[in-house]
């Protein structure tokens, strides 16, 4: 709701005011990797860094593991961290130092994780010392103080536990911190998000033998988590609801433990949740979470439930609207009006026409593709998407939407892409609408077979994701072009991309490679698409390898020529209508994130800015500080003024801050935020800062796997991306004597980022781990084989684990 406060002046008076002089002041930080490598006191340099240094730390080259990120260097950082914790008294400047040191450690572990299998791990002793640093911090009486800097320190030092993978050492202190959650502390969702790092770490320790052993000896923690969720059920009606949801969800994930008592207690909690929050009740997302965990790890607990009927009932309630486009799309939605759905149809029709022209398809589908219709399922918000989509459609939800092709050769198949709206006004505001629709079109007209068929020989992810990005952005993809100065990738490297690589390489560099090929070598693209349309993916991979080597030098030169070209509006998407006419002389200026802009102004003057918040932003706040009396007003996706705004914390003086809490998925809503700095009186030397931290650009943790088990079928190959661990299972019917499993790497062994290594473990009675299993194949690389004798019907369970660098692998099962 808008908070509107009228001042005794007219809008026209503001427009006619003479603009006062502004001056820019940017922080100069010696935090680049090269500067840190030359620093005589690394801990001091890290301690004094600003927020915008983090990107350089997380994106540092693997060579830094020999200097600033070496074991010896981190040992000295750990000593400095303990010293700072010992003297911590809750002061903001002290907290900033702690956060900097914590982020530096996390960056080191992230760089190590991405360095490949040839680089030694940090020692267990070092990781344990960092875990003890977290304990030391949480035992400090000021550890849970509130305030921007204080919360930043708490979040960094608790999330560090997942990086060093030492939750068994910190579980007690993190559980004790959780008990400080109450109605007062719940008001600060950033603080609550710091407590939530316990559950991030629990998810990150799935299939971790040390964690499962710890929980087997400390099952009282399951009782504590159940009481926590029950006692704090009131929080389900607040913005802090995610902490209760995640407490129960991660309790459910303990069903994967091989320890029977752990599993028994976790199952009892899930059954209690289902009874307390039945489907159709106000907080039935907890029922859904319990069902999801049980269906993955304890399906026997769901006997007697008609889940298919439950899905139909839920879909009818959550997505009641249906609109058929004249083309292939059928739009199901939670809150789109018919007029909005019709506009979406226009957008998709325009995109389809553009697609056929760019890809030169002749409107001819590939053979055996029966997906002549596609269902577009649009949730009203990210919260709804996270709550319901996985249960209804089986997709993961830690993303901006997903295309689910199914098996295109089956007549009863339903092609579907699932999306959500990032705003609920008159505009469509459907995230990644064109990107996901391009996936449907590309699969139907350019790619023979299923998604697994497409990935079977590698060298195609650059096209699948890069082409979808190109069709959405064309020449206007600023985020991709902005990557170039930070370090070029060769075309061959981009062509070798798999889904186990980072999002920049998959999407943005994929876009650059596709754009280069379409603009400079369209005939080669035609030749490649002729191969993919006929299912010749091995030949595709061979040809792409040749083209990469052939055009590497040209691609490098071409990158230097790029600049952003703004595309005209697509047909059917009207420009946003302003709430009031905008005066011609009013200018809205882009505000650079994480940089201080110093402003001065007269009474009643107004300065307008905007800042773009990208996807995967974990922290965003806008603040002013200075002399005089200036006020801060903001709006989302529309120009903000003092007389028309959505958010403000205006007060006497020029010291104000607006914080934006993350949504249920842990990220701040992406989009454009507008800022009005208005003089209630004159003001001078006021610093305006939009501080944000983006996980996609500076990944704070290793990429998370989809931990939902993949159900295998005999004779059908499945391709899985494994970062750290994945689960799979196959149901073996009566009469089968032996199950044989082949796992093969889909990556290029010559990839400069290093070949992966995924090990395969199997058990018949429980989910296996690296220590507790019945069968194992753990050779070097990701090519593994198991022959498993069976004597009765039931599931065989598999765990795929990457001790260092992950990989894309294909699993194939046969019964004998």
UniProtKB/Swiss-Prot annotation:
Enzyme class, first EC level, given as a word: hydrolase
A Pfam match: Peptidase_M9_N
Record-given protein name: Microbial collagenase
Cofactor notes: Binds 1 zinc ion.
GO biological process: collagen catabolic process; proteolysis
Family as reported in the entry's similarity comment: Belongs to the peptidase M9A family.
EC number(s) from the headed UniProt entry: 3.4.24.3
Annotated positions binding Zn(2+): 435, 439
Organism classification: Bacteria, Pseudomonadati, Pseudomonadota, Gammaproteobacteria, Vibrionales
First-listed, main subcellular location of the protein, grouped into a coarse class: secreted
Residues annotated as the enzyme's active site: 436
Keyword Zinc: yes
GO molecular function list: metalloendopeptidase activity; zinc ion binding
Entry keyword annotation includes Nucleus: no
PANTHER family the record matches: COLLAGENASE, MICROBIAL COLLAGENASE
Subcellular location: Secreted
